[in-house]
Amino acid sequence: MRRLVLPLLASLLVLSPLARAEVVDNLYQVREPVTSQQPDERNAALKRALQVLAGRLTGNPQAGQTPGLASALAAPESLISQYSYDAGPPEVLVANFDPAATERALGQAGLSVWGANRPVVMIWWLNDADSGATLVGDGQPASTGVQRGAQRAGLPIRLPLADLNEQLAGTAANIDASDPTALRQASERYGANALLAVHAKPQGNGWQAQWRLWNGSAADQGSSQAADQEALATAVLQDVAARLSKKFVSRPGTTQPLTLVADNSNFERYAQLQKVLEPLSSRLVKVEGTQLTYNLTANPDQLQAQLGLAGLQPASAPAATAAPATPAAATPGAPVDATATPSAPVAQPAPSAQPARTTLYFRWP
């Protein structure tokens, strides 16, 4: 690998625009509320933390209930590199899980892992109470619950600054609309991949929200309920993560051996692509000019979605190389030497047991 990377450093070290997807910070860290630091409470919190992490790493909020994960849940401390307490309020146990051990446990349970490189979600969140409607802006007190919910769900997010122009855009009419044009225009400066509009209201002793999600040309919607605003944000964003993961996570039995050829690369793009391909058992096998060639195992459609986050676009395969000429057949009627000793048949090599690889071509613009 070093022989491949060294020429890559020399040939690709030029600047390029940053891709929009982001690596999720503290992906393997879970902050779980506790009522004390007693051993029984700690053990219960570690189990809950593993269940939260299983949902975050797979995009499936119910992954922590998978029967194959039972042995790991019985001894979650075996997957933890360290833990500590944060006095809060509220007091929480901060558990840092070992990535390799955790992914191995999930794999043994038959669960596929969503990599740390994930789409950025632009959130327009409107809290509508008796005192009036308030757009949640970045840095405002109400944004804390949304940020915590995003961390629990494993999503990188953006919130509007909520300046005057954005207040005019983030109205109930625009947030409830099925047409996202107004919100998309107001979101352009944030460079996000997906757009989420949430309208939250008090309901009984709790809160409920209606939300709409746009990811490229795909649209989705749903509703969530919770006891308070922070719990509501967690519920909404875990549901959104579950919807997004269907596009990016390869489920068991849907993958195949692939060869990926990525052209027009540079060093920065190479580094970004390495992060995208890390969960896919990828191996860099060739570097030629600005072209990178990888062998990997993935679902082709979900690989394309992941590559799109890194700015790669499908490309045409190069013109096929001309096939070698076949020996000319004997001319009809030509004399045959009947005294010649027939040549022994040449043994053919056994067919390779390696599965055929489909080659996919992509390039950066």
Regions found by a protein language model. Give the residues of each.
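Bacterial N-terminal signal peptides that target proteins for export
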Residues: 1-8
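N-terminal signal peptide c-region/cleavage motif recognized by signal peptidases
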Residues: 16-18
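N-terminal targeting signals for Sec/Tat export/insertion, comprising classic cleavable signal peptides
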Residues: 28-57
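Amphipathic beta-strand/beta-sheet edge segments enriched in Tyr/Trp
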Residues: 28-31, 35, 187-231, 304, ...
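N-terminal segment of the mature soluble domain
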Residues: 46-68, 123-176, 273-297, 308-311
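Signal peptide-directed extracytoplasmic domains
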Residues: 62-125, 135-141, 147
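Short, solvent-exposed, polar/charged sequence segments at loop or secondary-structure edges
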Residues: 65-80, 156-195, 299-303, 328, ...
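C-terminal soluble interaction/assembly domains
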Residues: 248, 256-365
